[in-house]
Swiss-Prot record:
Protein name: Probable NADH kinase
Record's subcellular location: Cytoplasm
Assembly and interaction partners: Homodimer.
Catalytic reactions on record: NADH + ATP = ADP + NADPH + H(+)
Family of this protein: Belongs to the NAD kinase family.
Source organism (scientific name): Oryza sativa subsp. japonica
């Protein structure tokens, strides 16, 4: 079926601090605001990031206006209900914006990510001794301003097909939580300096189970294949094939684990398996794809974590398509 109803899902403009306004010559200089950035190179960098992001949004809107499609635009912070009645969602920002969009999508509506402000390697090299000049991460974004119309046309005419990516399902005390994670989840104490106390075991749908592992650690991270290149990889995990339907889990900074438990502190959750967690702190949290979506947990709560979740259809960049299975 032709894709003729499009939702443009955009990162807000005002995500960076504004440049201080110049005071009139006759006015005394105002006191500097607390923690205001004053390095002119940093200010120019932030200004340029806003400019490039706005230009990309305007370009996307201009391209859509030339197509025989119905479309609307919404800022990501204004979205609170599931997305229905569209054939395609276009996220404009970076991976974070695509992840936010995914939380409102079922398995039927594809999403195309546009990296609105890609990192410029020469800029990073030039400024690396002064500040971090990296820009937007777009690992899952198939398009930039340079190729947006080409990728959009291929998507609209069906020559560019979406890939089906696994997501993470979490049940709390047997009840399904409404958010499905596209990247990863983190189960931990809400204070990063506190120890997370919990037990877990891997269990299959046929009833087979690992032995119980009692943990004191910094928490439990579970990643999808799409999320295996993010925090999981930074923590010592491995990159998974993007088309895999397995999950990768890791206990973060385990405290004095038993030798018998060590082989199970990092591994895979295959299809037909889940991780069963019992939480033993007074308070805790499950974070979905970063810090924006969080569900509180308390002592005695159980979590069932698996890939038994609706897939997400994503138009992937060529390098991920070539990764294969």
């Amino acid at each position: 079926m032709a894709l003729r109803r499009v939702l443009l899902f955009v990162k807000p403009f005002d995500v960076y601090p504004p440049r201080p306004l110049a005071a009139a010559a006759s006015s005394p200089p105002p006191p500097p605001p607390p923690l205001r950035v004053s390095n002119p190179k940093v200010l120019n960098y932030l200004d340029d990031r806003c400019r490039v992001h706005k230009e990309t949004i305007n370009l996307c809107k201009s391209v859509l206006q030339r197509k025989s499609i119905d479309w609307i635009s919404v800022q990501r912070n204004d979205m609170s209900n599931p997305i229905h009645d569209v054939d395609l969602v276009i996220s404009v920002g970076g991976d974070g914006t695509l992840l936010r969009a995914s939380h409102f999508l079922n398995s039927s509506i594809p999403v195309l990510g546009v990296n609105s402000d890609p990192t410029c390697p020469d800029e990073v090299d030039e400024l690396t001794d002064e500040f971090d000049a990296r820009r937007s991460t777009g690992h899952l974004c198939a398009a930039t301003a340079a190729n947006f119309e080409q990728i959009l046309d291929a998507t609209l005419d069906g020559s560019r097909q979406p890939s089906e990516l696994s997501r993470i399902s979490v049940k709390l005390n047997g009840l399904q939580l409404p958010t499905y994670a596209l990247n990863d989840i983190l189960v931990s104490h809400p204070c990063p300096a506190s120890v997370s106390r919990f037990s877990f075991r891997k269990r299959s749908n046929t009833g087979e189970s690992s032995h119980l592992i009692n943990c004191r650690s910094s928490g439990l991270r579970v990643a999808t294949p799409a999320g295996s290149t993010a925090a999981m990889l930074s923590a010592g995990g491995f990159v998974m094939p993007i088309s895999s339907h397995e999950l990768q889990y890791m206990i973060r900074e385990p405290i004095s684990p038993r030798d018998a438990d060590k082989p199970l502190l990092h591994g895979l959750v295959k299809q037909g398996q889940h991780i069963l967690v019992v939480w033993y702190n007074e308070e805790g949290a499950v974070y979905f794809d970063g810090s924006h979506v969080m569900h509180s947990i308390q002592h005695g709560d159980t979590l069932e974590i698996s890939s038994d979740a609706p897939i997400l259809k994503v138009i992937l960049p060529e390098n991920l398509l070539k990764q294969g299975s």
